[in-house]
């Protein structure tokens, strides 16, 4: 039974050690991790580092630097660019390479900004997204083990030609039984826009993302997230997926990914 994504092991200097559970396994390859768990774990360390800064995250960028194995990982966070109004913080994850040497497999950078009262001028580009009746999920990942078991998916009915919409809710905690923050919960599903917005059949094409960039003009609230996503595929094997993100209160931000598109042979 998958009851969390990572188990906390110990500290090693500036690094924290975690054991990756089966809940991190990718639907592309069960030997590597889905992008959302590493994004969420590094977001957690960045939020902990920023706890007394008076700043909050406005953007998260995950760069996947190589295949992330489902094994023990080492994670650290640091201040890349200090500032009282604008600061960049970063985190990286390292894991053993096939030859045994340790290498950095993923990195997250975050812009953190000072907050002030702008409640009287709040503006949203999109009206709130309301969850409707769940539709069938017509792709070959239905029933896939690993990460997809840790998220409750409700794909929505949309008209032909419109962006795909799905509501996602994490089913398990991020680390052990620790309660994740709402931003960490969002990070636990944000990388899934690739699956929500896919324009190709995964049994005919591989379209893996190299990054995930999340912008939030408002911090999320709750455990339910609506993703309205759509992929664009170029003529030379490169694509982009973009999405709007919603919680139960309304529009909260956008996500974008770069895709490597390859035809299966």
Each predicted region: which residue ranges?
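Terminal targeting signals and extreme-terminal segments of soluble enzymes
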Residues: 1-265
